[in-house]
Every structure is written in C-alpha cells, then in structure tokens.
C-alpha cells in the first residue's frame, strides 16, 4: 500500500512550467482530485497535504528544498509518520523516456536524477516506487548526423518548459497515470503496471 506520494520539482514560479517539475504537476492533480490543499509545512521542508484518496489516507508532498536536496524533505515526513520506503511513490521527470511515456517501477538506480539520488541516500534504500514521467532527452533534438561528439545540455533542457506538442502528450501521460492511482494506492501495483504499460505508455 502506498502511504506517501512525492512529486519532485524545484520551488518558485520561474520553475513551475519547466520539465523538471513534472512530478509537481502530478501531485497537484492528485490534490485537486482529493479536494486537498497543499500547504507549506516547515517540519517537512515542503508543501504537504493529508488527503483521502480512493478510500485511503495518503500523504502528498512537494519538497521545497530544490531538487538535489529532496531527500531531506522525504525522510523528514517518512520518519515522522513511520512510512517505509516501499510505501513511498516518487513521481519525477524521466530523460530516458520520450514525452508521452510514463512507467511505474520499484527500486533501481537514480539514472542521473539528482532528486532520486538524494532520496535514496537519505532513506538508505532504493526500494521505493517511482512514477517516471517521460520528458525526452536533449540529444533527441540534435539531428542524427550531428550527434557524434555533441554534448547535449541536460541541465538547461530540464529547466525549460516543454514545447506545446510535448506538453500535450505529457499531460495525457499524467492522466493515464492518474487512472491507475487507485490500484497503486491500494498496493495492487502489478495490475497498475500492466494497465499503465499496456496503454501505450
């Protein structure tokens, strides 16, 4: 069963629409669905709401520590409520999936994602759930003929808003993720993965 859903992103209006904030977009939607208001909670270093989702009590969290210190926020809440790593779902932007793709998985490395890296370090575990929201990779913007030796600027890419056609398919992917959230929250993760990954994710 999932007791804590974390959306990753950077605080501040200048980052709201950027690719790196895709995790915030999902948690914002969940809060809206639950009629919950995310409020600044200093002891958890983030915006927090206790929500009633699909008949279960779920904690929603958007760390406000900047991405590379997200673990500080997650571990503060997890310790306070005695939530285990495998009861946590972290929604985050994923460079290795194209816009419009979304995948659910348990554990694994950080894939170069500084937010995941910090969460794993603070939890002393990689065994938490991840919802990987595809944003594409800047190398995909470079013509194949010019890719040899090119060094895509990943940092700049994730801190820019998606193009409109990308945003549309990312929004659709988030909607597909929301459709399987009842199963995820209730711990029916195999069913959720089958449904999510079958639906063109």
UniProtKB/Swiss-Prot annotation:
The active site is at residue 20. InterPro entries: Pept_tRNA_hydro (IPR001328), Pept_tRNA_hydro_CS (IPR018171), Pept_tRNA_hydro_sf (IPR036416). SUPFAM superfamilies: Peptidyl-tRNA hydrolase-like. The record marks 93 as: Stabilizes the basic form of H active site to accept a proton. One of its GO terms (cellular component) is cytoplasm. It catalyses: an N-acyl-L-alpha-aminoacyl-tRNA + H2O = an N-acyl-L-amino acid + a tRNA + H(+). One of its GO terms (molecular function) is tRNA binding. It comes from the Bacteria. GO terms for biological process: protein quality control for misfolded or incompletely synthesized proteins; rescue of stalled ribosome. It holds the Pfam family Pept_tRNA_hydro. Its EC number is 3.1.1.29. Its main location: cytoplasm. TRNA binds at residues 15, 66, 68, 114. Hydrolyzes ribosome-free peptidyl-tRNAs (with 1 or more amino acids incorporated), which drop off the ribosome during protein synthesis, or as a result of ribosome stalling. Monomer. Belongs to the PTH family. This is Peptidyl-tRNA hydrolase. It comes from Burkholderia thailandensis (strain ATCC 700388 / DSM 13276 / CCUG 48851 / CIP 106301 / E264).
């Amino acid at each position: 069963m999932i007791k804590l859903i974390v959306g990753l992103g950077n605080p501040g209006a200048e980052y709201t629409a950027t690719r790196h904030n895709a995790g915030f977009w999902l948690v914002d939607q969940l809060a809206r669905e639950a009629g919950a208001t995310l409020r600044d909670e200093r002891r958890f270093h983030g915006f927090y709401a206790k929500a009633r989702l699909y008949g279960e009590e779920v904690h929603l969290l958007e760390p406000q520590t900047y991405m590379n210190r997200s673990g500080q926020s997650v571990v503060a809440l997890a310790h306070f409520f005695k939530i285990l790593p495998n009861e946590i779902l972290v929604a985050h932007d994923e460079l290795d999936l194209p816009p419009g793709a979304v995948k659910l998985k348990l554990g694994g490395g950080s894939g170069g994602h500084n937010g995941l890296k910090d969460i794993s370090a603070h939890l002393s575990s990689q065994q938490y759930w991840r919802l990987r929201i595809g944003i594409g990779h800047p190398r995909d913007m470079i013509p194949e003929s010019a890719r040899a030796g090119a060094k895509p600027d990943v940092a700049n890419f994730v801190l820019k808003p998606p193009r409109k056609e990308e945003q549309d398919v990312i929004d659709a992917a988030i909607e597909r993720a929301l459709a399987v959230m009842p199963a995820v929250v209730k711990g029916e993760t195999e069913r959720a993965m089958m449904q999510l990954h079958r639906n063109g994710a």
